[in-house]
Amino acid sequence: MSIFFLAFVSSLFANPLQDALNKAKPDAVIKLHNGIYYGNLVIDKPVTLVGIGEDVEIRGDGNASVITIHSSRVCLKNLLISNSGKNMQKIDAAVALKQVKHCEISNCRVQNVLYGIDMDRVERSSILHNDITVAKNDIALRGNGLKLYYSHYNTIRGNSIHHTRDVTLNYSHHNLLQDNTFTHNRFATHLELSNANVLQHNRYMYNSVGMMFMGVKETKVLANKIYSSTGAAGIGVMIGDVSDFVFTGNSVRYNAKGIYIQGAEKARGMKRFFRNNEIAYNAEALHFHASIRDNTIVHNKFFGNIDDVLKDIGGDFDASNVVEYNYWDRYDGFDANGDGIGDTPYRVYQHADLLWQENHKVKFFYAAPVMSLLDFLLKLAPFIEPDLIMEDKKPIFRSF
C-alpha cells in the first residue's frame, strides 16, 4: 500500500487530483490537505481518498457527477463534496457508484448538488456518518439525498439527510438503515419492490412522509421515532401492498396521519405485524384505505389522538385481523377483576364518518358542531347501520 500527500495547486489546465488518481497504485491512500480540488473525478481502481484537514473540498464544475466510482474497494473520508451538474435524467450526483462492491463513504459533507449519493447496483458497501443535503430548489425539483437501485447488503448508518427530495430504495434487498436522522425531506425513506431490509433506530422529523413502503416483503421497522410530518396531509408511515411486514417498538407522534395502510379489497395474505409501538398525538392514529385485513395489532399504546381509527372508502374489518392487548385512552369500559384487561372489547365504529366515505368533500366540515351533533345522534339512536372498523377483544385497562 502506498501513501502520499497532495496539496492544493491552482491550475486552469490540469486536474492534479485526477492525475494523482491515474498514477496511484491499487489500494493507495491519497491524503488531501485543506483546499479546493477540482471534481468530475473518475475512480477506476481501489484507492482511499481522505481529507486530513477540516476544509478539504472537492468541487465539481457544475456538469455531471463530482465523483464517479467504477471500482470496488474505494473509500472516501472526511471530504466536502459540492457543485454537481443539474441533469435529472443523468442523475448528476455528489458521488455516483456504478456496479461496485465493498466501498465506503464516511464523515463526508455533501451540499449544493442535484443528487447526494447515487448507488447503482452496489453491494456490501457502507455510507457512514455523512451530512447530506442538496441544492436549494422547490422540493419537487430537488434530487434524492440517497438513491439505491438494485443494491444489496449495504449499511447506511449514522447519517444526517436533510432538505432533499427523497431517499429511495428500488429493487434493493437486505440493506440496513440504522441511526440516521431524516429531516425536511419529501419522502424521507421510500422503499419500493425491495425486500428483507431493516430500518432501526432512525429519527424522522418535519418530512412530508416519514416512511413509505410499496410492494415490499420481509421488512423490519424497529425502534424508530417518526415525528411531526408536515402539512395537512403529513403522514408518518405509509404502507401499501406489503407482506411479512414487522413494525415494532416505534414511536409515531404529531402527524396528520400516523400510519396510513392501503389494503386492496382483493388482496389476501399480506401479513402486517404491529407490536409494542407508541402511536400518540396524531390527528389520525390508524388510517385504512379500503379493506382492513391481515393485520396483527398487539401490545401498542394509542393515546392523545383525535381519531384512533379511520377508513376512507368501503371495505370490511374481517376475521384475519388479530387486535388485542392494546391500550386505548378512549376505552371507557371496566376491569371488575383487576387483571388489567377490560371486561368488554374496545370497538371503533364509523357513524357520521360514513358520509365522507361516499363524498370526501364532506370532510371539510369534519370538526364542525353540526357533524359532532350528527355523530352523537347516530350513536344514541342510529338510523343507519354503523360500520365496525376495529375491535380489540382484550384492551388494556391502564397504560402499561
Question: Which residues are covered by each model-predicted region?
Answer:
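Extracellular beta-strand/beta-solenoid scaffold signature
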Residues: 60-68, 88-97, 112-119, 139-149, ...
